[in-house]
Amino acid sequence: MARKQVSRKRRVKKNIENGVAHIRSTFNNTIVTITDEFGNALSWSSAGALGFKGSKKSTPFAAQMASETASKSAMEHGLKTVEVTVKGPGPGRESAIRALQSAGLEVTAIRDVTPVPHNGCRPPKRRRV
């Protein structure tokens, strides 16, 4: 039985000048998503997707690498300026923002949108090492 030829869709290059970089920095990983102003994703990257495993995912260097790869692929769509929204308490917050700037994107605003509970769920118990 012959296999059907499937035509793959080529990635369309959009011409978007300014967007939003969403940095989600948890204790275990850092995820960087770059969207246009309406929230449609242009590119994304994470420390785990780059091959960092285990505790190496939660390092500032892994966040820097994730931010660089996401910004490079977003700049192929013509992106020049970004607003940055940072969510979470992780160690990769500052290094991810610095990597966006060093990759050639102009950061216009930095916004911290970390969710703060008004005494909601009980937090996880303290670690005893």
From Swiss-Prot:
Q: Name one GO biological process term.
A: translation
- Which GO molecular function, any one, fits this protein according to its record? rRNA binding
Q: Does the keyword Lipoprotein apply?
A: no
Give a yes or no for keyword RNA-binding in this entry.
yes
Query: Which PROSITE patterns does the record associate with it?
Result: RIBOSOMAL_S11
Which keywords annotate this record? Answer: Ribonucleoprotein, Ribosomal protein, RNA-binding, rRNA-binding
| GO CC annotation | cytosolic small ribosomal subunit
Recorded hits in Pfam families, A to Z, give:
Ribosomal_S11 (PF00411)
Q: Which family does it belong to?
A: Belongs to the universal ribosomal protein uS11 family.
Provide the function of this protein: Located on the platform of the 30S subunit, it bridges several disparate RNA helices of the 16S rRNA. Forms part of the Shine-Dalgarno cleft in the 70S ribosome.
Describe the subunit structure: Part of the 30S ribosomal subunit. Interacts with proteins S7 and S18. Binds to IF-3.
Q: What is this protein called?
A: Small ribosomal subunit protein uS11
Q: Which organism is it from?
A: Staphylococcus aureus (strain NCTC 8325 / PS 47)
